[in-house]
Swiss-Prot record:
The lineage of its organism: Eukaryota, Viridiplantae, Streptophyta, Embryophyta, Tracheophyta. InterPro entries: Pentatricopeptide_rpt (IPR002885), TPR-like_helical_dom_sf (IPR011990). Belongs to the PPR family. P subfamily. It holds the Pfam family PPR_1. PANTHER family: PENTATRICOPEPTIDE REPEAT-CONTAINING PROTEIN GUN1, CHLOROPLASTIC (PTHR47936:SF1), PPR_LONG DOMAIN-CONTAINING PROTEIN (PTHR47936). GO terms for cellular component: mitochondrion. This is Pentatricopeptide repeat-containing protein At2g38420, mitochondrial. Coiled coil: none annotated. PPR repeats lie at residues 107-141, 142-177, 178-212, 213-249, 250-284, 285-319, 320-354, 355-389, 390-424. Keywords: Mitochondrion, Repeat, Transit peptide. It comes from Arabidopsis thaliana.
């Protein structure tokens, strides 16, 4: 059937006058392209103008040239450029224009950059002011920018005192404190030794059902052991309190507690921590056993030390030179010098070379036992085995020679120490000078006087 003429007239009219809408994709793509060229123009202009005297004019002209509006990324780039070139006085004009002239919602990242730039340059008041003015920029502040401000404030004790007031005001603004916020505060308190306040914060987090990062517990425990009195503080009870807040101590945490107890001369308690560690199915390593050995030997519980040494061997742990030194020292304290010498011999067979500490322990024990002959043998053995003598080695032997009235030998060792640039205590030099004078060896005594100046 043939179409009517009216249909053809309508069809021609539609083809001639209908409007085809622009693709939104093409419009967005075109806008992005213009903004890209504007950013390139801005970068180029800012690099050319090293002083950035008219930074806002540069920003606006770069985007006007490409017929588009400045973007948040452009503002952030300008602020970062000013911060890097230490032109912080120009940031305020950028912020003013951003607040008054722009309409977009300003990203929080811009304020984080400004706060960091001001804060780390010592402009604390300006950093605080920027944080509280964030709502004026069509932006809702959160823990993201609050954390940036806290990181600035906690650097110094003076500005740290401002934190409580700022936290109260931030909460009134609707800022929710997150785990990361508490972490910053606890780290700062631990650093300045306010471990009791840090502990209270952790307890508050636990009661408020905030998930606490295990590393935060470890940081707190480490700080407590650093700042508390190791001779009397109940660190085991403190550890139990932390357990109640869902903390499961690991190998490093137990090691910190053990070392703290040993420093306080509390060897028996160290053993109880080792036993608790095993109950918690945390496998002790060689460092743990070495620390516990040190503690029980300091308490003169030598049977326990022997048992622990056998235990670590049965567990397949290979003692290193530090473990051997602790155990050899225990044998020497029991006057079992033969056993100590055999242990050093075993070290060589098992591939753990004795170091200067090993020799110092044995030489001192031999001197104390009056066996200067074997002490001299070990002294020579050190040189043969390539073990460098330190100031403590020289001090032990010089003192031994003075004790048996062999002042000439003591003088010889002093000269050797000076030639090797090894430090010798002034009191020891004075003692040798006094003995030389008593022997009438005035020339040698006068030579040594130069080393006291």
């Amino acid at each position: 059937m043939a179409r009517s003429s009216s249909w053809h007239r309508m069809s021609n009219f539609m083809r001639k006058y209908r409007k085809i809408p622009h693709s939104s994709f093409k419009t967005k793509w075109n806008e992005n392209l213009k903004q890209k060229y504007a950013m390139e123009e801005l970068r180029s202009n800012l690099l050319t103008d090293s002083e950035n005297a008219s930074v806002m004019r540069t920003l606006l002209s770069s985007f006007q040239l490409h017929n588009c509006e400045p973007t948040p990324q452009a503002y952030r780039f300008v602020i970062k450029t000013l911060a890097k070139s230490s032109q912080l006085e120009n940031i305020s004009s950028v912020l003013y224009h951003l607040e008054v002239s722009e309409k977009f919602d300003t990203p929080e990242s811009i304020f984080r950059d400004v706060i960091a730039a001001y804060g780390f340059s010592g402009r604390i008041e300006e950093a605080i002011e920027v944080f509280f003015k964030i709502p004026n920029f069509r932006c809702v502040p959160s823990a993201y920018t609050l954390n940036a401000l806290l990181l600035v404030l906690v650097r110094k004790r003076q500005s740290l005192e401002l934190v409580p007031e700022i936290l109260v005001k931030a909460c009134r603004m609707g800022v929710r404190l997150e785990e990361s916020t508490f972490g910053i505060l606890i780290d700062a308190l631990c650093r300045i030794g306010e471990v009791d306040c840090a502990t209270e914060l952790v307890r508050y987090m636990s009661q408020d059902s905030v998930i606490v990062d295990p590393r935060l517990y470890s940081r707190l425990l480490s700080s407590v052991c650093k700042h508390k009195d190791s001779s009397c503080f109940d660190v085991i009870g403190y550890l139990e309190d932390l357990r109640k807040t869902r903390f499961s101590p690991g190998l490093r945490d137990y090691t910190v507690v053990m070392r703290f107890l040993v420093e306080g001369g509390r060897g028996k308690e160290v053993v109880s921590v080792l036993n608790q560690m095993k109950c918690d199915r945390v496998e002790p390593d060689l460092v743990c056993y070495t620390i516990v050995l040190q503690g029980v030997i300091a308490d003169e519980d030598y049977p326990k030390a022997d048992k622990l040494f056998d235990e670590l061997l049965l567990l397949g742990l290979a003692p290193d030179v530090y473990t051997y030194n602790v155990y050899i020292n225990g044998l020497c304290k029991q006057n079992d010098i033969e056993g100590a010498l055999k242990m050093m011999s075993s070290m060589n067979k098992l591939g753990s070379e004795p170091n200067v500490v090993t020799y110092n322990i044995l030489i001192k024990a031999l001197v104390k036992a009056g066996d200067l002959s074997r002490a001299k043998t070990l002294w020579k053995e050190m040189e043969t085995n390539g073990v460098n003598r330190n100031s403590h080695t020289f001090d032990i032997m010089i003192s031994a020679y003075i004790e048996v009235d062999e002042v000439v030998c003591a003088h010889g060792l002093l000269e050797e120490a000076f030639n090797m640039n090894v430090f010798v205590k002034s009191s020891r030099i004075e003692e040798v000078i006094s003995r030389l004078c008593e022997k009438g060896l005035m020339d040698q005594a006068v030579e040594l006087l130069a080393h006291l100046v």
